[in-house]
Amino acid sequence: KYYGEGELFEYDLLSVCTRAHRPDGTLLFREKLVAEPFLNPVRAIGTMHDYDVFANVVVLTPPQEASRIYEQTKAYIDRQEDIAVGISHLPNDCGLIFKVLGKETSPVKKVVRQFCSTVRMQVKGKPLPEEFAWR
């Protein structure tokens, strides 16, 4: 939106597949995201709607850790910050998926860092270090 003529979603196809397997090859989960803005507008409700930025965090962790992280994380919509946040358990007790929608990169990045700090605190006993000012 800040480039050229303010282009948003000016692409033909976005296809992203995320999957995880156990060391023996057993599939734990698979998520496929496909966007074709010229066939199915991403501004539709249920897709991006009014948001421009999308973040996706996958946490592969044992069920007890996933439950504790899930309990500490709220799903919400903040109309002042223009942020929507969701969290779900992945299938096969393999962890969590955390999603954030926003209108600007900075607030989305902040929410993702807060979540990652919660995860690190739960798993390692230490939060993420503060972000350096020049990043």
Regions found by a protein language model. Name each.
Residues 3-135:
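A structural signal for small-residue-enriched, beta-sheet-centric alpha/beta enzyme cores
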